């Protein structure tokens, strides 16, 4: 059986054919209407697309192996003394073994494609969550709309909601410009974040003209609003802004995504963020587990300010679950700001084991002990205190000194090196080393584009066949895998990432 399966995999072809020719010209699966490829060469995204098209009754999919060659090779494995044995082998092969093996090959192809899809999604999500924040700026978040108007929400430097207004660019474009200019001056806005949904191009033009005509000292950028509507209707949003309409919550979310993408995006189910590849066609349990792992990894890599983090962010910190995260927020609300890592032990439910797991990831800028605002774990404070004077005075820390510290504190060299790095560059944020969002004062439309023009953009999504890039117009540009580099690219994720 294993021999047959391997031979089928190496030699059989996959064919798909449209079921209703009348739908061919309008079907989204048009390319699969008469599709064929060796099974081993079918790309993962093609497998998932074929499965979906077959499930929706648009096409039929078949695997066609070379039965005769396989049978001949199979006969050679046996000493056939008469035709009876040959007929028995042929019958069992065609009626039992071959159909079973073909089903297994389809299942294997699907499993591999799903695993690949989950890997692509998790990689894209990681890079999206690591998008650098625009810190210390007052932001005007704009959620474009047509029928009910465009919602605008002003936020202070910390993301606190200041006020909102609504403009209708369809019916009163000039009044919209006046409203934006007034808000910029009234709230001291420094950056404008425009959601990329329906009506985005008109709103960008309105903002651009307002900046130029009113001589406003601000810039704007386009923010991916995938999942903003999901957040707006969520329990988290209702708890944060119970008195606000959900459309205003959406504008707040867009603005906060620019100020601190990680803190805002963790409030949304990762599957709603829109950086996947056929994510609805894969095993949802496996997908959820993998995406949660990615979010937890990024949150712990960046670190969390214990006094400003939401319940949604805290629950991803190592050792902290949703229930404990709510207890931390409740403690903070009742007692005021937490002033030391040692105080964490006073929170109900946060025992010694949990403290050991989470303390190094929770930062406290308000603490009198500067180490409470670093990656250094409390169990290594004594070691850090010995190293700090040496680093401050820029003295060389020799191997002999490190060996002495290792023996004294029972730690490895990696721990010592990590502490030295943190003390040299306290409060380092891994996101600071990545490309910042593109800020602009003018706007492009599709008609402005000319062949040969060089434009800058931000990668929104990376898939097997290329990358989707936001270049500041309504339409998202596709950079095909063949155009990504001057050299051969096997996997776009090897050379390009979401957020770049």
Ranges and model annotations:
Residues 35-36, 57, 73-93, 97, ...:
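Low-complexity, acidic/Ser/Thr- and charged residue-rich accessory regions of DNA metabolism proteins
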Residues 239-337, 352-388, 413-441, 450-456, ...:
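Long, highly charged, low-complexity intrinsically disordered interaction regions
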Residues 64, 77, 128-132, 158, ...:
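Conserved, well-folded catalytic cores of nucleic-acid-processing
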Residues 1-141, 145-243:
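Duplex nucleic acid-engaging cores and interfaces of nucleic-acid transaction enzymes
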Residues 61, 143, 192, 258, ...:
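Residue-level signature of catalytic and energy-coupling elements of molecular machines
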Residues 4-10, 142-146, 198-202, 223-230, ...:
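A glycine-rich phosphate-binding loop feature that marks nucleotide/adenosyl-phosphate handling sites
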Residues 122, 174-177, 181, 200-208, ...:
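Amphipathic alpha-helical transducer elements in NTP-driven molecular machines
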